[in-house]
Amino acid sequence: MPPIKRQPRGWVLPGYRYLGPFNPLDNGEPVNNADRAAQLHDHAYSELIKSGKNPYLYFNKADEKFIDDLKDDWSIGGIIGSSFFKIKRAVAPALGNKERAQKRHFYFANSNKGAKKTKKSEPKPGTSKMSDTDIQDQQPDTVDAPQNTSGGGTGSIGGGKGSGVGISTGGWVGGSHFSDKYVVTKNTRQFITTIQNGHLYKTEAIETTNQSGKSQRCVTTPWTYFNFNQYSCHFSPQDWQRLTNEYKRFRPKAMQVKIYNLQIKQILSNGADTTYNNDLTAGVHIFCDGEHAYPNASHPWDEDVMPDLPYKTWKLFQYGYIPIENELADLDGNAAGGNATEKALLYQMPFFLLENSDHQVLRTGESTEFTFNFDCEWVNNERAYIPPGLMFNPKVPTRRVQYIRQNGSTAASTGRIQPYSKPTSWMTGPGLLSAQRVGPQSSDTAPFMVCTNPEGTHINTGAAGFGSGFDPPNGCLAPTNLEYKLQWYQTPEGTGNNGNIIANPSLSMLRDQLLYKGNQTTYNLVGDIWMFPNQVWDRFPITRENPIWCKKPRADKHTIMDPFDGSIAMDHPPGTIFIKMAKIPVPTASNADSYLNIYCTGQVSCEIVWEVERYATKNWRPERRHTALGMSLGGESNYTPTYHVDPTGAYIQPTSYDQCMPVKTNINKVL
């Protein structure tokens, strides 16, 4: 029989019916959302051709609609189709669209060609429909950063993307997506930054009221910065509850930050009146220190992190750093003239100017993006229900015997160990418990101080004056004094009072362990435990209020990294994103250094992909979970529950450790 006459299908992607050129308008039912968007795109092209226009040579409204239709589609076809027409938008002339041509002009005027990123490193809004495969595919693979990193956080100097005045460069993103392998958190905040230090670098002396305490020398800069280093910045209380109730471990994998919808305004004062005008020519300097070339800014537990509540304005903190240990270089030796050692240290004091790096200068209506990759360990959420020394069957006799020394006598005997008391090879972790904090109450000391005292320097204070206090390295040892318990302030909003939260004893049997040694008559506590073979312990349990990471110091050698607060030690955490107002000089009759008084506000969004593992258990009994039960009441009239707002708008923050929902309290693990 003669062959069936088939209609040509066009140059479509394999498995698709419309995603490609030259296919017929009626080629069957679209296979997915990307194919359906391509079908509508083909019909729009057909109408343009009928009107006498060539849509293949010009970027047009049909192309713009196609890109918009695929903004939430992360299938392979959607990525390829969207990428193709984004390239066309950047290089092809607009088809009778002056607004689009103006946007192209801003794109080329402000883009950084050396920092172009692949499709996979672009921001990923709209993750509510993502599957595990989609989320994995959308993670950044490579970033064109100015440094070569072998994992950890990297930052790219993304091109400034302009859309002109009155054209939005992005929408507000928020919410979280939970799946079996990945969790995606999305948050947006309104930020504001102002002129710092009159555009100058200055050295400030920070003195304490305690004369024998620590003094510091700080270099303050014209720059401010963004800090995303806290779990509460990314997880709502309900999201954190779900994460800690359903997953046995998690870790960050990729982070994308977008700064957009910039509005630069000039402050004009005329007597008692103040007006705020849009300034379309002023700019802000923005760059990311992806190679960690400047002193670290995102120290754990700082108060400058992104606000918990999405409607709160984020007032960026000024960036400053310590250039030298002040007590070692204050030139108070040799009768206050300074000795050779002090001068040698002072001569080598560094001075970091952030303007010494390439960066963008963005104007009103423009935007920029930064991408980071993480290479870090997991945060484990399982608790040990028994210590490792009880990993045995207590009904089965053991062949082990022990040597027993009789009380008050040199006589000894040998006895068989009972089945329920078998010895173990597993020892508690290392730690130090033999120190206490030095008073008085106004002192800024710590239980342990690390001091650097080069020979020849003149020291006229105690150890607190030239030492650095650090959290007691307790490993998994149980706190014997209050100094060893993690504490932090949780200030109730609007009260001005400091609410002190103290970490509770852990519910995991691989934490809060103690080592005792026998002396023939009793057992005594061992306060200092060094590192030995066969020590096993769990890391400190974190809460929603904890920092995510801490930066490892660049050192030749180090032992096992186990930060006291449970944060993740990273060689390359996300680089700090710095921002400052551009200096706009104005002429004066006296030739004084004068400039326009401006500030900048805009939106900053942060999206993090978290790798997760759901828990699986053979435990028959129900387990403990974080719930709303047990939350306290506060606020005006004392009837507003935690994580809610009272009639005055004050947000009721947690007042106890359990309300912060710590990990390692719910899911049991088999050792």
Swiss-Prot record:
Pfam families: Parvo_coat (PF00740), Phospholip_A2_4 (PF08398). One of its GO terms (molecular function) is structural molecule activity. It comes from Primate bocaparvovirus 1 (strain Human bocavirus 1 type 1) (HBoV1). GO terms for biological process: lipid catabolic process. One of its GO terms (cellular component) is T=1 icosahedral viral capsid. Changing H41A: Almost complete loss of phospholipase A2-like activity. Its EC number is 3.1.1.4. Residues 106-161 are annotated as: Disordered. This is Minor capsid protein VP1. Residues 136-149 have a biased composition (Polar residues). It catalyses: a 1,2-diacyl-sn-glycero-3-phosphocholine + H2O = a 1-acyl-sn-glycero-3-phosphocholine + a fatty acid + H(+). Heteromultimer of isoform Minor capsid protein VP1, isoform Minor capsid protein VP2 and isoform Major capsid protein VP3. Isoform Major capsid protein VP3 is a homomultimer. Isoform Major capsid protein VP3 is 10 fold more abundant than the minor capsid proteins VP1 and VP2. InterPro entries: Capsid/spike_ssDNA_virus, Parvovirus_coat, Phospholipase_A2-like, VP1/VP2. Capsid proteins self-assembles to form an icosahedral capsid with a T=1 symmetry, about 26 nm in diameter, and consisting of 60 copies of three size variants of the capsid proteins, VP1, and VP3, which differ by the presence of an N-terminal extension in the minor protein VP1. The capsid has a channel at the 5-fold axis and there are densities extending the 5-fold axis into the interior of the capsid. The capsid encapsulates the genomic ssDNA. It is an enzyme of class 3 (hydrolase). Belongs to the parvoviridae capsid protein family. The keyword Iron-sulfur does not apply. The keyword Metal-binding does not apply. Residues 11-66 are annotated as: Phospholipase A2-like. The N-terminus of Isoform Minor capsid protein VP1, VP1u, contains a phospholipase A2-like region. VP1u may play a role in the disruption of host tight junctions in the airway tract. A motif (Nuclear localization signal) lies at residues 614-625. Keywords: Capsid protein, Host cytoplasm, Host nucleus, Hydrolase, Lipid degradation, Lipid metabolism, T=1 icosahedral capsid protein, Virion. Residues 150-161 have a biased composition (Gly residues).
